[in-house]
């Protein structure tokens, strides 16, 4: 997935702009006597973007990580002189930043720094106010070194800085010492929550009693605003909002450490037209209301759910946290489907993937039934291109869908190890070869029968088939599978099967492990244990697992398996 954002040195995020990398590269190329706008620069830039996209699928890269990537790619492409010039350029810029920081520190000491307040007015910047804030937030924290934080803060202060940037700089200065003592984690969480409270409530509050009152009032206002803007389900207005607001316990925010608050703030809290509607406890209560919306005693049940969620004894899965109480309450985590050897059904499943990903569902697709490369298509009398081209389409569908606007789509494709296209399947995540036969953004998994492992142990041959000629292999397991598999091998020896191939089982196993080491894929999953232990064996065969390989449910052409996840806190 392409990189879209960059984390700046002050912790803020900006759009990813390749022209900035290109400009720095051009200076290094020119300094090294190379063509600053030639094909070599374009090739390096392309490689840099590719590495960043591959290595930062979930989290945006920082400026330093981008610069490290530039250095690596220059060395990889034997541009040693250019690399040397870039390193010098990078060191010079770091020195300039340090000089600016030192100048700012001197200005801060002599009182000549200015700060822009939230109302637009300017006033002299002093560290006294920052120190007062620190002491207030760290009043009960004995291991906090105020001087250490202020010293780190001074590195990012400059004349004309605004109040929001000071707060962000203070947060980053505190985060820098989280590994020093857990209390810095608590303090960082409080600093971030202070910012969050101000954004939701609309102003700063000076006392705990005042915060509690404003906190609860903001919950009621947020629910009404969310319904008014068409974001929340109107049924939420039928709850006793005043009673629920009194059940909210703002002190439970202390249970959430810095990374937890940051994750909730960036990805989970509801924002409408740029306005944040939720505090942590309002968020838990909104989820609780969404889970109770069809209950007869909805207010009682909402308070019960809230008590469990807000105390972190149990936390629902991401789709539930995203959508509970919203106008489209899709609460399920994972979907497991099996794709049949029919063009209409193939594209129906791809369309289903798109819709389920759209609402934050994780996808596990079984593709074993699709006929292999070279198998004859009855209707057109031409040879099939196999399963790989369809997997490429499924991959690109995964890339195209941004799950609920919060994270990229995620899919895992499963294929049984006797499929004639299994060797191409193993290469899907490689960075070399024909990119039209690669799925860089989709997970893959081997669905391995026990018979294959027996052949590996005994160093025997393994037969690969096209599923259109062996349709019952995928619908059987255990002894029944072994009997049918051996029968198909005998038929292949008699030339009664058109498409098949024999490989050494141990060589195929080694290739599986090699690709797993190289690319992390395909994952290793086992068909027979999943089916032997299935409590639903009367309802059909388990064809695959889900995106995360922890759920095994049977499915069919007209039945998609669904799982709903949550985390129980055993601490």
Residue ranges and their predicted role:
Residues 1-571:
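Extended catalytic cores of very large enzyme megasubunits
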């Amino acid at each position: 997935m392409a990189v879209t954002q960059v984390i700046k040195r002050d912790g803020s995020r900006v759009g990813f702009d390749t022209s900035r990398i290109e400009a720095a590269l051009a200076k290094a190329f020119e300094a090294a006597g190379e063509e600053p706008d030639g094909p070599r620069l374009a090739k390096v830039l392309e490689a840099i973007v590719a590495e960043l996209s591959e290595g930062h699928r979930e989290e945006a890269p920082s400026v330093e990580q981008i610069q490290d990537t530039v250095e690596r790619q220059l060395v990889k492409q034997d541009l040693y002189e250019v690399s040397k010039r870039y390193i010098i350029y990078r060191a010079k810029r770091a020195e300039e930043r340090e000089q600016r920081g030192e100048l700012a520190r001197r200005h801060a000491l002599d009182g000549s720094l200015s700060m822009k307040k939230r109302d637009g007015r300017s006033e002299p910047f002093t560290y006294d106010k920052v120190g007062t804030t620190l002491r207030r937030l760290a009043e009960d924290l004995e291991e906090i070194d105020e001087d250490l934080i202020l010293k780190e803060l001074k590195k990012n202060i400059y004349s004309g800085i605004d109040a929001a940037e000071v707060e962000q700089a203070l947060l980053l200065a505190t985060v820098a010492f989280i590994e020093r003592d857990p209390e810095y984690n608590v303090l960082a969480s409080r600093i971030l929550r202070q910012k969050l409270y101000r954004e939701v409530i609309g102003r700063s509050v000076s006392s705990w009693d005042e915060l509690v009152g404003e906190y609860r009032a903001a919950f009621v206002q947020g629910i009404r605003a969310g319904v008014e803007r068409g974001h929340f389900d109107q049924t939420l207005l039928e709850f006793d909002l005043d009673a629920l607001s009194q059940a909210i316990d703002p002190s439970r925010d202390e249970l959430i450490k810095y990374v937890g608050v940051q994750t909730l703030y960036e990805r989970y809290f509801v924002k409408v037209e740029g306005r944040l509607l939720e505090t942590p406890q309002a968020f838990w209560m909104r989820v609780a209301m969404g889970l109770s919306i069809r209950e007869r005693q909805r207010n009682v049940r909402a308070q019960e759910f809230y008590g469990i969620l807000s105390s972190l004894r149990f936390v629902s899965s991401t789709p539930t946290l995203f959508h509970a109480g919203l106008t489209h309450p899709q609460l399920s985590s994972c979907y497991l489907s099996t794709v049949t050897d029919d063009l209409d059904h193939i594209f129906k499943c791809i369309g289903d993937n798109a819709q389920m990903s759209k609402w934050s569902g994780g996808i596990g697709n079984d593709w074993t039934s699709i006929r292999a490369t070279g198998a004859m298509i009855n209707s057109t009398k031409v040879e099939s291109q196999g399963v790989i081209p369809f997997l490429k389409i499924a991959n690109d569908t995964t890339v195209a869908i941004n799950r609920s606007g919060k994270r990229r789509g995620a899919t895992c494709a499963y294929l049984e190890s006797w499929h004639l296209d299994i060797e191409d399947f193993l290469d899907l995540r490689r960075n070399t070869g024909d990119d039209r036969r690669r799925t860089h953004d989709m997970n893959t998994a081997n669905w391995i029968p026990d018979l294959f492992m027996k052949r590996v142990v005994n160093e025997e041959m393994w037969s690969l088939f096209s599923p259109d000629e062996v349709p019952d292999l995928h619908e059987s397991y255990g002894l029944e599978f072994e009997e049918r598999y051996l029968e198909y091998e005998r038929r292949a020896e008699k030339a009664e099967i058109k498409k098949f191939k024999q490989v050494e089982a141990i060589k195929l196993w080694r290739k599986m492990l090699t690709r797993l080491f190289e690319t992390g894929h395909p994952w290793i999953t086992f068909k027979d244990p999943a089916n032997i232990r299935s409590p639903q064996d009367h309802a059909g065969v388990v064809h695959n697992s889900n995106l995360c390989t922890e759920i095994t449910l049977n499915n069919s052409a007209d039945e998609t398996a669904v799982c709903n996840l949550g985390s129980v806190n055993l601490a």
